[in-house]
Regions:
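Surface-exposed loop/turn segments and immediately adjacent short secondary-structure elements
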Residues: 1-118, 123, 127, 131
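Compositionally biased, low-complexity segments
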Residues: 12, 157, 163-166
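Conserved pre-motif C helix in the palm subdomain of viral-like polymerases
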Residues: 79, 117-148, 164-177
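Short, glycine/acidic-rich hinge or "gate" loops at secondary-structure transitions
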Residues: 148-159
Length: 178
């Protein structure tokens, strides 16, 4: 019963500090002509394989319970079917419902362990969703660099995982798959 009480307290606290997305995407001014738009992402099996092999084996799985170690070890067999799946999902602007879910895990920060505000929520999302987003992020980064919309020197954050590219890829995922 005590663990149920703790879970309820944490849930109440996390809900009280949660902000709801208004669904409005930020306006991004158009700085390139229509012929240079990023309309598609090529989910080549080699790219998917590379991203699968980069997975950290101890990465926690999300609601689909697919472990990173399994995906990494089966990269050779999974890269082609996942390439096809990602391409189809991207072209349809669709995501499996389970990829839109997360397991919320409370992580203790400091202070009294009995105070719910001393915990921060960590969202464990599906590894395949993060994998697809990672391929999209790389394509966006290449596009932005190629068209001189950003460069390595003035890009905010640490290249190549810059906040600008992460923000754009998140906005793209939300806009396409919401």
């Amino acid at each position: 019963m005590e663990s149920d009480f703790k879970a309820e307290r944490l849930s109440e606290h996390f809900s009280s500090v949660y902000t709801v997305d208004n669904g409005i995407l930020p306006h991004i001014s158009k700085k390139v002509d229509g012929e240079t738009e990023l309309n598609n992402v090529d989910f080549k099996p080699e790219l998917v394989y590379k991203h699968l092999r980069k997975l950290k084996e101890k990465t926690s799985s999300g609601p689909d319970h697919l472990p990173a170690l399994l995906l990494k070890n089966l990269a050779g067999s999974l890269s082609e079917p996942l390439s096809l799946l990602f391409s189809k999902l991207f072209s349809m602007s669709a995501l499996p419902d389970i990829w839109k879910l997360a397991i919320i895990t409370p992580v203790y920060k400091k202070g009294s362990p009995s105070d719910a505000s001393n915990y921060r929520p960590i969202s464990l999302t599906c590894i395949l969703s993060k994998l697809m987003e990672s391929v999209i992020k790389d394509a966006m980064l290449s596009y932005l660099l190629e068209h001189k919309l950003i460069n390595k020197k003035n890009n905010t954050g640490v290249y190549p995982s810059a906040p600008l590219v992460r923000s754009y890829s998140s906005a793209l995922m939300i806009g396409l798959f919401h």
